[in-house]
Amino acid sequence: METATLVTIFLSGLLVSFTGYALYTAFGQPSQQLRDPFEEHGD
């Protein structure tokens, strides 16, 4: 395979992995540990 093809596949996989991890952190199991500053502000 050509170098450009391998770099493109690597960067695409990296982007998909990062997006999946961000969604898991935002909406998955670890999201229960995130604090909500709007709920802390008792107004």
Swiss-Prot record:
Its main location: plastid. It is found in: Plastid, Chloroplast thylakoid membrane. It holds the Pfam family PsbN. The chain crosses the membrane at residues 7-29. One of its GO terms (cellular component) is chloroplast thylakoid membrane. Keywords: Chloroplast, Membrane, Plastid, Thylakoid, Transmembrane, Transmembrane helix. It is a single-pass membrane protein. Coiled coil: none annotated. InterPro entries: PSII_PsbN (IPR003398). GO terms for biological process: photosynthesis. Belongs to the PsbN family. May play a role in photosystem I and II biogenesis. This is Protein PsbN. It comes from Ipomoea purpurea.
